[in-house]
A protein has these predicted regions:
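Acidic, polar-rich low-complexity tracts and alpha-helical solenoid repeat scaffolds
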Residues: 1-365
Length: 365
């Protein structure tokens, strides 16, 4: 389940946020830009307006329109190096969002070829970040790490550096370089990161370092996070990590208890809830050999996870196989019960049948 865990537990933060902004505000901005473009007195700034229109569409989720605006800028304003490079970056990002990877790669080849000629460090860092995003999409983690380090080194934007450092830590973790991952998570923890990123950096660092930190064991470190009111909305993730540590120690009953706590504490994080159900399903299937309970948890996992999740089809197939297994199990149990009844003496057999058909009613006092 490595692919699913990568998405649910340690979901990589996109190098460029695609979170939709206020829709009405974006529409108003686009109208302002359209008016601006049609006013010939501002002709020297039209390329800037096209860039802003492209970005407005991108952040509003209109990736096709965004790509068209950036493409127009690329074709018509090559003399403005800053806007030309910006348009290349953002067109590639738009195409990646549209899953048009081959076309995005062509843009990135152009971008890569002109990087050595660039002088502006801001432009260079953004280009490195775009190239890194493509390599992340293609699971080329080693190349992505190199490019991200270059992006961080050349950037002067503090929030970009923090964001990219967090992603770098995730990539180091994914490539099993836990020492570097811990170091980078610690950098994020000490920075002015947004709270959610800060919290996840702390959580991931604790998960990787194990029983350290002034003699406290991992469970104690994680439980300490629950005492801080700032972490109230993240209790599901904390309980999940506590359960994970118990599972590693083969304390499966305690693991089940905390996985269940994770599911009950989940508010809006359906990905986390899905992974907790998946863990419960796997434990019941592999360790407890309780296939009926495992089937129920697999059903819950499938209900929560979106169909485009990694390995969704694999989990669905396992669920269907378990359905067949549980059907056969129930049939065998029925046959065993019938054969047991058939072996009874006739007077006991009829009494047994009557007790099953008409359960004894306990008399009220």
């Amino acid at each position: 389940m490595a692919g699913l865990e990568s998405q649910l537990v340690n979901r990589a933060v996109p190098l460029v946020s695609t979170r939709p902004t206020d829709a009405q505000r974006c529409r108003n901005k686009r109208r302002d830009f359209d008016t601006f473009i049609n006013d010939k007195s501002f002709s020297n700034y039209i390329d800037d307006a096209y860039i802003l229109l492209g970005k407005a569409n991108f952040f509003n989720g209109n990736f096709f329109n965004a790509a068209e605006y950036f493409d127009y800028t690329i074709k018509n304003y090559k003399d403005n190096q800053s806007n030309y490079l910006t348009a290349l970056n953002w067109k590639a990002r738009s195409l990646m969002q549209l899953k048009r990877i081959a076309e995005a790669n062509e843009i990135l080849d152009t971008l890569d070829s002109i990087l050595p000629k660039l002088k502006g460090k801001k432009l260079v860092s953004e280009s490195f970040a775009t190239l890194a995003q493509m390599n992340i999409n293609l699971n080329n983690d080693t190349a992505a790490i190199t490019l991200l380090k270059d992006a961080i080194k050349t950037s002067k934007q503090i929030q970009n550096k923090i964001r990219w450092t967090y992603i770098l830590a995730q990539l180091y973790e994914r490539t099993q370089n836990h020492q570097e991952a811990i170091r980078r998570y610690k950098e994020v923890q000490k920075s002015n990161a947004p709270f959610e990123m800060y919290f996840n950096a702390v959580l991931n660092r604790i998960r990787l370092i194990g029983p350290q930190n002034a003699g406290k064991n991992k469970q104690e470190q994680l439980l300490a996070l629950l005492k801080d009111n700032k972490n109230f909305n993240y209790r599901d993730q904390v309980y999940f990590q506590i359960a994970e540590s118990f599972a590693v120690d083969k304390e499966y009953d305690k693991a089940v208890e905390n996985y269940n706590l994770s599911t009950t504490q989940t508010r809006d994080n359906q990905h986390q809830k899905g992974l907790s159900y998946l863990r419960l399903a796997e434990l019941n299937f592999k360790h407890f050999r309780d296939y009926l309970t495992a089937k129920e948890y697999y059903d819950s996992t499938i209900t929560i996870l979106p169909k485009n999740s990694p390995e969704y089809n694999l989990i669905l197939k396992k669920t269907l196989n378990l359905q067949y297994l549980t059907d056969r199990y129930e049939l065998i149990a029925l046959q065993d019960s019938l054969q047991e009844i058939a072996r009874l003496p006739e007077e006991l057999r009829m009494a047994k049948i009557n007790s099953l058909i008409n359960p004894v009613q306990i008399a009220k006092p």
